[in-house]
């Protein structure tokens, strides 16, 4: 049984294209290949179909077909652009700061061109990027904002799709040396052979390929620009070659030539394909399919109304609800709800090991769990857009109202996939205005939610650390000793009926009132500073005047 499509109730007023899932549960979406970005926010019940659009800050440079990634601290990395106002195949890079809605230009790699280079976020949070002009690769460290050379490949990275595997290797089908494959062994900083494919996935005239992703069973799946598909089984030892088998073909000569794909929570992969076209020919329309890894079958599903163009215009985003949002460079966007047919195994779910049960708005907490970064990067396009969603989101549902809010997550302990029973952690910040009372908290990754835990959301509290001795001195008599001492419920008199009360008591009262007013004023100032700091919490603050700092409290 196939899934179903729904249009967004509030359709975009722009040319909806590349999308990324931010760690607060919102979706950022580019307007065509320009500088403008928009944000889709789900409604009060966590429904994206009924969500609303709002504008975001614009990038410094327009870019179309480029490297992109959401980082472990929640920032968004972008580099290159096959087409850009900074020049064709630009090497310009920038970083988006969601907490302050701001873009900062960051250092470019040493190459003169980045263009539509593939990239992959490594388990430690760094980003591996490939050169489109040579065999070189480089790694960007988002903490230090520096580039370092990585090992060279067997061929150029041009047009390749990269897949992060559970054994901490990055798998690539070689588009410039097809049908060979290779993989990057992260621990060894080495590219090694991943064998030879039994069937061609790369179209020779365009050296294009389709999407690829790790599957829940540990294999990797690639869809080809030739209409064929293939599956890779990793070896027991990371630097060995592994094995390939053929998958099902797309029917009727259709091809996934520069196309997105998405691993859904039911274990199936949503794919698109278009009629065959050689070289620079990319005919439409786009047709949709579900690949079932368990049955090794390709099944056609209904096409949405915005599928009239070629498949390279399409983008997919896996929503925290388990649905898939599809855009195609138009002012239409549709949501696919997969059929429950398929298997959602319990061991695919993230699991909460520990989480505070008393939460407060505007405060930060730590959640520990297993499989917080999922079994796969889940969403793929290839070289033209990095769309991975393998990071934890925290979702809270108020039991009384049913309202849903997402907490911004950051500082994930790893970005690896398929981590099994290894305990991981992430930080999350309860948003301002969070409804108080009993609630259920879930951690969500790749559209799959953990079992919920009960929490209680309390009001925001601003804490002061008071020195009791200093307070006693403040409200006491310097000549005769303290008139008051600080008790569990506030100041209490030492001798309420004796002769000490008089003018000294009145003076002490005035001092207390003055001190409280000063504390209230200080509290307002501290709260303003706290709000400013909160906007950067968990992120590396943008470089200003040569000074960089991590803001935390």
Predicted regions and their residues:
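Sec-dependent, cleavable N-terminal signal peptides
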Residues: 1, 529, 552-553
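Kelch-like beta-propeller repeat domains
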Residues: 1-462
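C-terminal "tail" modules appended to repeat-scaffold proteins
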Residues: 448, 545-552
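Extended alpha-helical heptad-repeat/coiled-coil "stalk" and oligomerization rods
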Residues: 462-467, 496-497, 505, 539
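Compositionally biased low-complexity segments at domain edges in trafficked proteins
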Residues: 467, 471-474, 478
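Short linear proline/tyrosine/threonine-rich motifs used for host-factor recruitment
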Residues: 476, 483-485, 491-495, 549
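Long, heptad-repeat alpha-helical coiled-coil segments that mediate oligomerization
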Residues: 504, 508-511, 515-518, 525, ...
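Coiled-coil heptad-register positions
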Residues: 530, 534-537, 544
